A protein has these predicted regions:
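C-terminal transmembrane helical hairpin of 12-TM major facilitator-type secondary transporters
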Residues: 294-341
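A late C-terminal transmembrane helix in Major Facilitator Superfamily
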Residues: 352-384
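Cytoplasmic membrane-interface "Motif A"-like loop-to-helix N-cap segments
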Residues: 80-92, 290-301
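Hydrophobic core of transmembrane alpha-helices in multi-pass small-molecule transporters
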Residues: 110-130, 321-336
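Extracytoplasmic gate region of multi-pass secondary transporters
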Residues: 33, 234-277, 370-374
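Glycine-rich segments within core transmembrane alpha-helices of 12-TM secondary carriers
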Residues: 151-175, 198, 362-373
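C-terminal ends and interior cores of transmembrane alpha-helices
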Residues: 45, 92-111, 302-317
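Helix-to-loop junctions at the C-terminal end of transmembrane segments
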Residues: 69-83, 281-293
């Protein structure tokens, strides 16, 4: 059974709701990375600026530890009660926690309680983000035409980047309009306060949604699981052990602390790189629809391993044009990998446990690889004294992920999102006609 064709009006509503909510979610989550240097000074004071920065980036990574738990709780909610309630809750949690970060007193005011409260709120952000990616991707793709799922999947990757991009624009505005002293004293709080009205908008948009045709079909068949997590052992979760994480929020820190650019110039270049990434995402999605998910994600992973070191060499040159070339090369292959990753997470799991399984699989990889990314990158750059050092981590992750995917990943193009079977007519040129259900 194919996903029912939606009307043009409903398609616009579905895409708009998923995109808007995802932008708001990642805007809130990314602000921390853009203000990591300032937050490090205020909440982790030290005689060494590097030590303060590393402490702030460590807290950035702490949020990723909570993402698997958020995936479990919000994924279970989405599989039991519907995709919409979980998506609405994720926006609420992110908005409240981000707003509260804006209100936190610094270490100079309340001492050690300040970093402890910051860690707690970052954990809530991580919990929320743990359910957002898989939930939004599932909601979008369960509404998408089967032959356009790759293109629709690119909306999630692109809007994630747009959310980060908008956070960068706001950070740029604060840098341009305020002095460094004003940013440190109170200006950094203003972007975080934007989370409150944005959360209200996100809640309104998502509350008005209907649930997906796939979940409605499960309800009609009385196949909605009461305990979806119990069946995950058969769902193929172990086949997604590693993922890719775009170090967008680290780039601006790298450009200012390692390369030596001014903050305004670093933010402009980072914003440009994110814009390029978001523009490439639809092309990556169409590639997956045309040639298959497996070859596209393998090309992305292998490409990242190849271009990471040259890209960081260009980034480390300090020349804006060369930096932009390096970011563009990195963004192109990152888009191929990330767009297909979201699509595969939906198509690999059965409808009854789709959000739980994909959220846990994705977030375990993020907690192990993505969360420590900025901290590892900054530590390598500081320890080795090389601007190219963060690329070593990217190469290692990309190679390991590509090898694992090449070994275990089936082709999923043409998968029916209810039955889990794949039409032989949709098979790619490899001739692999294995159904997804058989690979579980």
């Amino acid at each position: 059974m194919s996903t029912p064709r939606t009307t043009a009006a409903r398609s616009r509503q579905v895409v708009g709701a998923a995109a808007a909510g995802n932008v708001l979610e990642w805007f809130d989550f990314a602000l921390y990375g853009f203000f990591a240097v300032t937050i490090g000074q205020l909440f982790f004071p030290s005689t060494s600026p590097t030590a303060s920065l590393l402490a702030a980036l460590a807290v950035f990574g702490v949020a990723f530890i909570m993402r698997p738990l958020g995936g479990v709780v919000l994924g279970r909610l989405a599989d039991r009660t519907g995709r919409r309630p979980a998506l609405t809750l994720s926006v609420l949690l992110m908005g409240v926690s981000t707003t509260l970060i804006a209100c936190l007193p610094s270490h100079a005011t309340i001492g050690v309680a300040a970093p402890l409260l910051l860690v707690a709120l970052r954990c809530v952000q991580g919990f929320s983000a743990g359910g957002e990616y898989a939930g939004a991707t599932t909601y979008l793709l369960e509404n998408a035409p089967s032959h356009r799922r790759g293109l629709w999947s690119s909306i999630i990757s692109a809007t994630s980047a747009i959310g980060v991009l908008l956070a960068g624009v706001v950070a740029l505005g604060a840098t341009a309009w305020l002095t460094e002293e004003q940013v440190t004293a109170w200006g950094w709080r203003l972007p975080f306060l934007l989370a409150a009205p944005l959360a209200v908008v996100g809640l309104y948009i998502r509350y008005r949604l209907d649930d997906t045709p796939v979940f409605q079909e499960l309800e009609a068949r009385d196949e909605v699981p009461q305990e979806p997590l119990r069946s995950l052992g058969r769902s193929g979760i172990g086949r997604i052990g590693l993922g890719f994480y775009y170090l967008a929020t680290y780039v601006v820190t790298h450009l200012t602390t390692v390369v030596g650019l001014g903050r305004t110039e670093a933010l402009l270049l980072t914003i440009a790189g994110l814009a390029i990434y978001s523009l490439v995402c639809p092309l990556a999605g169409m590639s997956g629809d045309r040639w298959g998910r497996r070859p596209t994600i393998l090309l992305g992973g292998l490409g990242l391993a190849v271009v990471a070191i040259p890209s960081f060499l260009l980034i480390g040159s300090g020349t804006p044009a060369l930096i932009l070339i390096g970011l563009t090369a990195f963004a192109m292959f990152e888009a191929l990998a990330n767009v297909m990753l979201g699509l595969l997470l939906v198509e690999l799991f059965p409808a009854r446990t789709r959000v739980s399984g994909s959220a846990i699989g994705f977030n375990l990889a993020q907690a192990a690889v993505g969360g420590p990314g900025p901290l590892v990158a900054a530590t390598l750059a500081a320890g080795l004294g090389l601007a190219v050092a963060p690329a070593f981590y990217v190469v290692a992750v990309a190679l390991l992920a590509t090898i694992a995917l090449a070994r275990y990943l089936p082709e999923t193009r043409g998968t029916d999102l209810i039955t889990g079977t794949r039409s032989p007519a949709a098979a790619p040129a490899t001739g692999d006609l294995t159904t997804v259900e058989e690979t579980r």
